[in-house]
Amino acid sequence: MANISRLTITTSEFVIRSSREPYRIVNEPRGPRYRGLLREGARVSDRFLFVDIPEPFYREHDTSFGPAAKRLVEELAPHLISLTSDRSWPGTRLGEVHGVKSYARIYRYRLDAESLEMLERATDHLFSWQPPLPLDLCLLRPDGEAWLTTIASEDTAYLRLAPEEVAPLMDRTGMDLQRYLRH
């Protein structure tokens, strides 16, 4: 069993915090490395999410999704677990714009062989998870913790890994990872 340091309970799900640490993905995974990253993620993750921030307003049918994002959402519909409105998701917390709180639609899906194939077909590189595609692909472990966090608009992504997971993952994917130090 993982070394559990604390238990955090949120209103939407239980999240177990472990000894996992964030590791920044040094170079954007593209092509085979992108597909390898997703396949490695599917080994330890059972869900994924991405986001729609309907700007500038948040009315029922407003969306930032263009045709490619809408097609992907339609294709993934059988895998949809939930669609919620929230101000935060892994790696991001929305602020206020002109005194108005911003909200995003968070799409959560089951990650299985079929949905994995759809993610692989949607694009061939990690930081393309922004318009015209949905924002910020994240892969979630069964305990609710993000395995992969993407902040595509900032060309940033990191993985939460236990120390013993780092070297084997780098060997299998060919990716460079760097321990993410917070200031």
Predicted regions and their residues:
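Structured alpha/beta or helical-core interaction and ligand-binding surfaces enriched in interleaved
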Residues: 1-183
